[in-house]
Amino acid sequence: MGKKGIRYCILMCGCIVMLLILNLIMGSVSIPFSATLHVIFPFLHDEVTSNLLTIHPSWEYIIMESRLPQALTALLTGAALSACGLLLQTAFRNPLAGPGIFGISSGAGLGVALVMLLLGGSVTTAAFSVSGFLAILLAAFVGAMLITLLLFFFSSMVRSSILLLIIGIMVGYVANSIISILNFYATEEGVKSYLVWGMGNFGGVSMAQMPLFASIVLLGLLAALLMMKPLNALLLGEQYAENLGINVQRTRNFLLIITGLLMAITTAFCGPIAFIGLAVPHIARLLLNTDNHLSLLPATMLTGAAVALLCNLLCILPGELGILPLNAVTPLLGAPIIIYVIMKNK
């Protein structure tokens, strides 16, 4: 990684820390920074802050059970989705390839739609029952992984990356068609529940679930970082990569597994999140002005984490008026970037 890449990553780390703090102190209930710091780091004893927390005992619960897990989820999910987008754009040499294009998000949505229909709409929009929540989580994960395995199967039969991309798009269309049919026959409550899930939300991971969620995401990100050199070779074309000794099909399959795992876990917990995986790699590429994955991949992960935290912050800005749907905010940031990329490559 060059000096420019290091400076960029340091800058992004600073932005992440600042946005993380803002996510913890802002919301429908305003909590002082000193109180937030005291809750997260109890050893930083301060008598005045301790008295404040005694007067407002709910602050600790709000921070530890709502804002902190939500901020950490946004950070990890943003990094994961952005990494998935960059992996797919490089592997298929298509600037508009993204996690949603290959139908993995649609697979997760299909799993959730099946569960909500089979439960007869018993999964309420206000709060899931324990069994309902676990069913939705498992259904989203299984649906996403099944689509990934299906793409893995086609990948063993099709050598062309372009053809595999087209197959992925078609699989996504089929999944979305089945979802539409299921919604047509579902109860009103079931349709409403599915729509709420489909809006996306970083608040789906509790502190108790965070170790599992973080472990899987970090494992996927580490696996992605190990692919930086093969990704650089793929940039120059499949034939050139093969001449360098890269097994293109095996590399492509490994990238699909990484993408499927990260998309499955993030979509299962957070719902389908639009544009972050598609737009953030272009943001990092434009700011760094490089295609070298030794710099670009870590920078994309950090940029994705910062963008997701920013989106989460924008969602909670209305305060007491409510929380904006995540997928109502992400296109506002992502769509202009995609339009710019299309116009640049016209």
Question: In which residue ranges do the predicted regions lie?
Answer:
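Alpha-helical transmembrane segments in inner-membrane proteins
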Residues: 1-346
